[in-house]
Regions:
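Short hydrophobic transmembrane-like helices used for membrane targeting/insertion
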Residues: 7-8, 26
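Conserved, well-structured core segments that form or line functional sites
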Residues: 23-183
Length: 183
């Protein structure tokens, strides 16, 4: 059986970052967006806005770097060792957040993709600040810190009203660079 090659996707914006437009008119990504091939989802997440509303503050970041994990056959994926208490979210339905702690101090967020039981996900590696974000956002741990994402959001439905991904209401032309995953 041929396996898909793991990749990191990073965007390089051809247009300058635009002022955040009011949230009216933006649509949450539907469940069907996530219930597709992981590499397709990873590519199409680039340029989307990740929104987390907490404590009366709406934080928004534009997704600019992602990494695809392709299920149990992908030895770099947490799911490669089978279903565990930690990884059970990856085996669940698409469109949910898989959030975990690394090195005992940094949270990382993945978006679960493909059908229930497939155990694939896309790691969000970096965002560009759009609204109410301060500090660095380049790297999975810094992204989560800036958006206030922690293990309390593990398993959270990304179609909820407080944590979701949207298509921005202004399309931008982007160029996508694919690179082999490191490590």
């Amino acid at each position: 059986l041929a396996t898909k090659r793991p990749i990191i996707l990073r965007t390089f914006w051809l247009l300058s970052n635009r002022e955040f437009a009011q949230s009216s008119g933006v649509q949450k990504l539907p469940r069907t967006f996530y219930d597709r091939d992981t590499i397709c989802v990873a590519q199409e997440l680039l340029g989307k806005w990740l929104v987390h509303k907490a404590g009366g503050v709406e934080r928004v970041g534009k997704i600019v770097e992602v990494e695809a994990y392709l299920g149990e056959h992908d030895l770099a994926a947490h799911s490669s060792k089978g279903r565990t208490e930690r990884t059970k979210i990856m085996f669940g339905p698409p469109g949910h957040a898989y959030v975990y702690l690394i090195y005992g101090m940094h949270h990382c967020m993945n978006v679960v993709t493909e059908r229930d039981g497939h155990a694939s996900a896309v790691l969000l590696r970096a965002i560009e600040p759009v609204k109410n974000l301060a500090g660095r956002t380049q790297g999975p741990g810094l992204l989560c810190r800036a958006l206030g994402i922690d293990r309390c959001l593990n398993g959270h439905d990304l179609l909820s009203d407080d944590f979701f991904i949207v298509e921005p209401n202004v399309a931008e032309k982007i160029s996508i660079v694919k690179r082999p995953r490191i490590g």
